[in-house]
Amino acid sequence: MAVTTVAQFATELNRPASTLLEQLQHAGVSKASASDPLTDTDKEKLLAYLRTSHGTSGADRKKITLTKKSTSEIKQADASGKARTIQVEVRKKRVFVKRDDPTGASSESHDSQDVQELSAAEEAELQRREEEALREAEALRRQQEEEAAQRQRAAEEQARQEREARERAEREAAERAAAEAAARVAAEAAAALAAAEKAAATAPAPAPVAAVVPKAPAPAPVVAAPTLAVASLGAKPVAPAPTSGMRVIKAADIVAGEAQKQIDLDKRRKAAEAEAAAIRAMMAAPKKVMVAKKPEEPKPVVPAAGAVGKDGIKGTIHRPKTAAGAPAPGAAPGAAAKPGEKKSVKSEKLSSSWADDAKKRGAAAPASKGRAPDVRGGWKAPGGARGGRRGDRGGAVSNFTPPADVQIHEVHVPETISVADLAHKMSVKGSEVIKQLMRLGQMVTINQQLDQETAMIVVEEMGHKAFAAKLDDPDAFLEEENLAEAGESLPRPPVVTVMGHVDHGKTSLLDYIRTSRVAAGEAGGITQHIGAYHVETPRGVITFLDTPGHEAFTAMRARGAKATDIVILVVAADDGVMPQTKEAIAHSKAAGVPIVVAINKIDKPDSNLDRVRSELVAEGVVPEEFGGDAPFCLVSAKTGQGIDTLLEQVLLQAEVLELNAPQEALAKGLVIEARLDKGRGPVATVLVQSGTLKRGDVVLAGQSYGRVRAMLDETGKAAQEAGPSIPVEIQGLTEVPSAGDEFMVLADERRAREIATFRQGKYREVNLNRRQAAKLENMFENMGQGAAQTLALIIKADVQGSQEALAASLLKLSTDEVKVQIVHAAVGGISESDVNLALASKAVIIGFNVRADAGARKLADGNDVDLRYYNVIYDAVDEIKSAMSGMLAPEQREEAIGTAEIRTVFVATKIGTIAGSMVTSGLVRRNCRFRLLRNNIVIYTGEVDSVRRLKDDVKEVKEGFECGIKLKNYTDIAEGDQLEFFEIKEVARTL
C-alpha cells in the first residue's frame, strides 16, 4: 500500500491539515505535524471515529468516495488553419469501502483487490471522458467552420448587392449628366450659330466681324442631377434598422460605402464638366459664316491677346485694319481658340469646300423661304436633330489619323523561293506580289518558284531591302551543329604523306617502316589495299597515306580540306633533286604543310649529300643546319639506318603543330578511296579527322549515305570504333562516293537521306528555274558573255629551254572563249605523279622529246588520261590549236543537195497527198529538208517524209528520174511548184 502524508490526505479530502490533525487526535491516532506518514490503519481509525461522531453505526457497510480533478490542453486546427487550444478536464474518483472480514489478512487482501478494481474503473472512465472531450472539440470546430462560412457568404452577398446598387446609381447619374450636358451644348451651339448668321447677314461688308463667343453656362445644373440622384439613392432603405452589434457594424459599412460612392460621383461629375467645357469650346467656333471673297494672297491672321470671359473660355479679337499683320477688310472672322492651338486654321482649311458650297447656295435662301435660322442652324449645324454628326465635319478636329510609316523589311532571298514565301517574308498578301510581277510583265501563280534575281527585283520594287541569302542547302548548318556538339579537343596522331620519285626508294622506305612496326602475322598486302595504315612508336602513333595519298592530297587541296599534316619528301642521295621532287615541293607549299626531308640510299658509295642539300636549297627547302625549318634525315631503306630518327622528327613536327581533335563527338573526315565490291557493295576507305566513328553510325558522304554495317581496320580485322587520324574501311553506303569527298556522321538517317537527295537535285532544280525565268532581253544581254572554257595542260620537256618555249607558245593561243592553263611545267620524263596530278586537275599531258615510264602508262590507260608526244614544237602548237577549236561550239551550215519540179498532185488512200515530181538537179533523200517555192517565192519549209520510185520506198532519187514525194505535215501543193532540197551540217569552227 502506498503511504501518504497527512497533508496529502487533507488535500484529497479538501480539508485543512489542522482540522485533519485534530480529528486524528480524537480518533486515537497520534500525529504531530502535517508531514507525518499516514497508513491505511490510521485512515480506518479516522473513518470509524467519524462514523461514530456523526451517528453512523460501525456495523453498517459504508464507503468513502474521493474525487480528484486534472486539467489538460488539446490543440486543434480550425477552418481558417489556425491552432486553437481546448481545455480538457478529467475527474477521478477513488472509493474506499469498509468490509467486515473475519481476519485482518483477508481484509487487507480484499482491500488491495478493491483498490485495483477501482483503478481499472478509473482508467476506463478517464479514457471515455477523453474521447468524449475530443468529440466535443471536433463538433465545436465544425460548428465554428459552418458559422464562418455562413458569415462569409452573407458578407459576399451584401457586398454584391451594395456594388450593384452603387453601379446602377452611378450609371443613372452619368446618363442623366450626359443627356443634360448634350442638350445644353446643342442649345448653346444652335443659339450661337443663329446669332453668328444673323450678325453676318446684317453687318456691312467692309467692317470686320467679331467672332461670336457663347457664354458658358454655370456648372451648377450639371452638378444638381448627380447630387440629387445620390441623395435619393442614400434615402432608400438599404437594410433594416440595426438591432444588434452586428447590425450596427453593417450600418457603419453602408455609410462608409455611401461616402465612397459620393466621392466617385464627384470625380465623374468633374470629368463630365471638363468634357462638356471642351465640347463647348470646340463648338464655339462659327460653323457657317458668310464671308467676303478673300484676296488671292491673304496675309496670315495674327490673333491678339485672348480675352477671358466669365465662363473661363478664351476668345480672339481681330486688330483694327491699320494694325500690322491685320487681315483684309473682307477677311473672315477668326475662330475662338486657345493660344497655341491651330484648330481654327485647320478647320477652316478642311471646311473650305463646304463653305464654298454654302456660298453658292446663297446666304439669304433660308430667310426667303421663311424658315427660322435658329431652328436647325443650317445643314451643318452640329446640334441639330438630323445633322448632329455631320456638323462635326465642319469645324471639329478631324479624327483621321495618318497612316503609320510603312515598315521596311530586310528580306534574305535564297536561290529559289515561291511567291507565297516571298510574300510572307515581306508581311504582305500573296496577291500583292502577283500584281507586282504582272506589272513587271510576268504571269505567275502563288506556288510558282522564282529565281533569286527576279525575287530581289520584286522586293526592291515593293520598297523593301533585298539581300542575297546563302544556298538554302540543308547541310549549310552541319558545320555549326558539329562545332556545337564538339567536346574537348585532345591530341591526335599526325597524318603523313610520303612523296618523291619512285626510284628514290619511297616504296622501300614504306615497306621497311610497315614490316618493322606492324605486329608479326599481319598481311602486308592489306595495307596496300586500303591505301592507308598507322604505325605505333614508343613516342606515339603515326598515320601514313600510301601512293594514292598523292592523288587524294591534290584533291583535298582543291576542296580546301587538309587531311595531310606532314609531308615526307624522299630524295635519293645518288640522284639528287629530280623533276618529280620539284612537283612534290610545289604541292606541299601550295597546301601549306611542313616538309621532312628523308635523304635515302646513303649506304651507296656514290652518294653526294652536299649536292642534294644545295639542290633542295635552290628549290626553297632549307635545312635546319642552314637556318631553315626543314629537318633533314639520313636514312637507308635497305639497312634501316635512320628510320627511328625520321619517325621522331615526324612526331616532333606534330608536337609543334599541336594537332588536336575532339574525340567525344560525331565523326567527320575524308574519303580516301572508294570502290564497288561484287559481294559487299560500295566500299569506302575513310580517314577520321575528328570525333569517333562507331559501327552502326549513319554516315553522309557526298551524294551517298548509309549506316555503317561493317568496319575494318588496316589489318583487315573487324573494328567497333575508330578515333581521329585512324583510317578504316566501311560498308553500307547507298552508292560509291567520290575520292576526296567529306564524310560526316549524323544522328538521324532521315536527315542524311534528305541532304543526299537535296545534293543530287540541287543544281538541276536551280538550272530549271533559271531557264524558266530567262527573258528575251536577258538573252541578248548575255550573248557572247558566257564563261570561257579552260584547257589544262601539263608540259614535260627534255631541256629547260624547250619547256619554256613550248609553254610560251601555247599560252599565246588563249582567246576569249578558250583559255590555256599550264598546271605544271618541268623538265624530265612523265611519271606517276604527273598522271595523278593530271587526274586531279583534268589536264592533258604533253611530252616534248620525253616518254612516260611503264607505271605512268599503265596508270594513264586505266584512268583515261590523254598523253601526247611531240618532237617538233609546231606540231604541238597545231594540235593544241585544233583541240581548242574542237572545244568551240560547232557552226551549222546549209548544204543544197538538189531540186525537183512538181508535175502532178494526187491523193493516195491511207497515205495522203503525194507530189509527183521530176528531180531536175542533184538528188532528193528521205528525211531531208526542203523549201517549197511558188512563183519563186518560198511559202513553206519542212521535212521530206518519204520518197517512192515505182511503188517502192527508196532512200534517194537522183537527177533525171521521176518519183513520188510525201511531205511531212503539209498538203498545200500545186502543179508547177518547185522543191529545193538541202541538209544542215555542223562545221567545226577554227580559231
From Swiss-Prot:
Residues 500-507 are annotated as: G1. GTP binds at residues 500-507, 546-550, 600-603. Residues 53-85, 97-175, 312-395 are annotated as: Disordered. SUPFAM superfamilies: Initiation factor IF2/eIF5b, domain 3 (SSF52156), P-loop containing nucleoside triphosphate hydrolases (SSF52540), Putative DNA-binding domain (SSF46955), Translation proteins (SSF50447). Residues 525-529 are annotated as: G2. Residues 97-113, 125-175, 339-349 have a biased composition (Basic and acidic residues). Residues 491-658 form the tr-type G domain. One of its GO terms (cellular component) is cytosol. The keyword Protein biosynthesis applies. Pfam families: EF-G_D2, GTP_EFTU, IF-2, IF2_assoc, IF2_N. Residues 600-603 are annotated as: G4. PROSITE patterns: G_TR_2. Residues 323-338 have a biased composition (Low complexity). Residues 636-638 are annotated as: G5. The keyword Cytoplasm applies. One of the essential components for the initiation of protein synthesis. Protects formylmethionyl-tRNA from spontaneous hydrolysis and promotes its binding to the 30S ribosomal subunits. Also involved in the hydrolysis of GTP during the formation of the 70S ribosomal complex. NCBIfam families: IF-2 (TIGR00487), small_GTP (TIGR00231). This is Translation initiation factor IF-2.
